[in-house]
Amino acid sequence: MENKRTKTWATIVYSESAPPNWIEILKEQHIPAFVSPKHDKDLTDDGTLKKEHYHVMLLFEDLKSVEQAKEVFEKIGGVGVELVNCTRAYARYLCHLDNPDKVQYDANEVISIAGADYTEMLNTSPNTYTIIAEIIEYCQQNDIDSYAYILLYAKNNRSDWFKVLCDSGTLSSNS
């Protein structure tokens, strides 16, 4: 990884060891970035609760080396430097959106910094189809045949589903 250069790098920030104002420090770097919701429910393979942490992804405009990414991560108390192969996939990982065996975190709690747009990052055609497939599967598993019910469920529990339902040209009414 020493010689690799990419536009997207990631790290983990542990609440207990990061500066208390680490998000402000990150904002002061003026680098587009995403900060995951606080991961405070993750478990190890043996069921032990992991240390509370955040995932941080930097979205540079140009190729950067591991040393350049590390320089930013050290300012915020980041542990490790991870080369991100697929920006969209890692963005989804911030909330475990494609990992049903892991705790699902709310995509609305992702912090977007310096012009990065998390909602736009997730809003792709394949993602829309994946979400619609999830909704259909959920409806089948839970015997749901009311569009109004699934729309309200999504509004209250799954913002990613709610956006797709609203943006996909579907319509509901109480009549």
PLM region spans:
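Short, glycine- and small/hydrophobic-rich beta-strand elements in well-ordered beta-sheets
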Residues: 30-48
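Amphipathic alpha-helical transducer elements in NTP-driven molecular machines
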Residues: 51-53, 66
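Short glycine-rich, polar/acidic loop-and-turn segments at beta strand-coil junctions
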Residues: 39, 60-62
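Intrinsically disordered, low-complexity segments enriched in glycine/proline and serine/threonine
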Residues: 10, 31-32, 58
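N-terminal start-of-chain detector that recognizes signal peptides
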Residues: 27-28, 52
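Conserved RNP beta-strands of RNA recognition motif
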Residues: 54-60
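Catalytic "initiation/cleavage/transfer" segments centered on a nucleophilic residue
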Residues: 1-10, 14-23, 27, 63-175
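Short, flexible turn/loop "capping" segments at secondary-structure junctions
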Residues: 2-4, 48-51
